[in-house]
Amino acid sequence: MAHPKRRQSKTRTAKRRTHDKAVMPTLAKCPNCGAWHIYHTVCGDCGYYRGKLAIEKEVAV
């Protein structure tokens, strides 16, 4: 296997790792039920997406 000829500096290592952060997903409030869901996805509570029923959900009795 290949081995590095020179040690990488702390600055170069830090510059490479600048994009490796954890990002919080953007959330939106469902206008139908008021629950929070990720943008551009179906609401997990009611099954609606953009005002239309996308997934048939069973109502708990």
Swiss-Prot record:
GO terms for molecular function: structural constituent of ribosome. It comes from the Bacteria. GO terms for cellular component: large ribosomal subunit. This is Large ribosomal subunit protein bL32. Keywords: Ribonucleoprotein, Ribosomal protein. Pfam families: Ribosomal_L32p. Residues 1-19 have a biased composition (Basic residues). It comes from Porphyromonas gingivalis (strain ATCC BAA-308 / W83). Residues 1-20 are annotated as: Disordered. The keyword Ribonucleoprotein applies. Belongs to the bacterial ribosomal protein bL32 family. GO terms for biological process: translation. InterPro entries: Ribosomal_bL32 (IPR002677), Ribosomal_bL32_bact (IPR044957), Ribosomal_zn-bd (IPR011332). The gene is rpmF.
